[in-house]
Curated annotation (Swiss-Prot):
InterPro entries referenced in this protein's UniProt entry, alphabetically: Anhydro_N_Ac-Mur_kinase (IPR005338), ATPase_NBD (IPR043129)
Organism this protein belongs to: Rhodopseudomonas palustris (strain ATCC BAA-98 / CGA009)
Gene that encodes the chain: anmK
Record GO biological process: 1,6-anhydro-N-acetyl-beta-muramic acid catabolic process; amino sugar metabolic process; peptidoglycan turnover
Pathway stated in the Swiss-Prot or TrEMBL entry: Amino-sugar metabolism; 1,6-anhydro-N-acetylmuramate degradation; Cell wall biogenesis; peptidoglycan recycling
Coiled coil regions in record: none
Primary enzyme class: transferase
GO MF term set: ATP binding; kinase activity; phosphotransferase activity, alcohol group as acceptor
Name of the protein in question: Anhydro-N-acetylmuramic acid kinase
Amino acid sequence: MMMTAIGLMSGTSLDGVDVALIKTDGRRVGALGPSGYRPYTETERSLLRQALAEAVQLTARDARPGVLAEAERAVTIAHAEAVAAFVAQNRLSPGSVDIVGFHGQTVLHRPAEKLTVQIGDAKALAKAIRIPVVCDFRAADVAAGGQGAPLVPVYHRALAQSLGRDGPIGVINVGGVSNVTYIDGTDTLIACDTGPGNALLDDFMFRTLGKPFDCEGRLASQGVIDQAWLTEALQHPFFAKPTPKSLDRNDFANLTLRDWSPADGAATLTAFTARAIAAVQPLLPKPPQSWIVTGGGARNLTLMRMLREALAPASVESADALGWSADAMEAQAFGFLATRGLKGLPLSYPATTGVAFPMTGGLLARP
């Protein structure tokens, strides 16, 4: 039975809350509905940056010491406002939406310690929006020994079924962290994080220019890549690890950045993202013949050019060019995953997160 789901995603880029409507039975995508966006205020972003810094000390997934409790309240309120605005704008009644998938804000992800922490109060959200909410998508996988990420691949597969393309397809999601899904038209589904997405570049832009990101990659297009630094950065042990594998937003934060000009730094860090994605190819059964780029990185024209160079001769195109939505993809995915979780269907697999067996997930909070 098809359900109407709203998915909510607040990624590691800390830019805001993506909202998307999807009709799905948890196996197939019936229709993609409208999408929306509620940006975080600079005050909220600052609070979340503090929460990320303090979360490094966490040893329990339900602990909310200090600023984390305040950040959780802010995240919950922002998501409630995002849903309220989306429902009003699209003239939906709460009764017309069956379920909301609420990812929350990841502040710590350490699967080796069986610890992943997403802040956001699902019970308070369900009460505020008067719609049942599924949350806590990653915890069961991590508790069972999986990486807890990426979770979107099963949604990528559902979308790719409608393309009818020959040969393997790779779907690249460039958020704060980048990840790749490998789909070959059979039951094979392989996925992993590939390295930094927008996080290093966004942090660099904020530190050097006070800007949240490099709009369309304009600054990077004017810079010169520091090839020596790039070669050294690609020696990071993460890149040689077999799939599946996952990252925390801060796993590359200790890389020593040089005293670049803003343009050269942007060019170098954008190239690092592209080359890190290309480095996953030898770890896949066959190189994909076509790549589809989603997430905020699909809007970065310089990154798209660098990906085409790094992944040639394969084709590289934005999800938007296929009628998908590069911006709404992850939000749609969590609507899809909420429906799968309600039905007890797997969210993760051995070749996507390394979990020992297909694993469902998610907890239900009722209004």
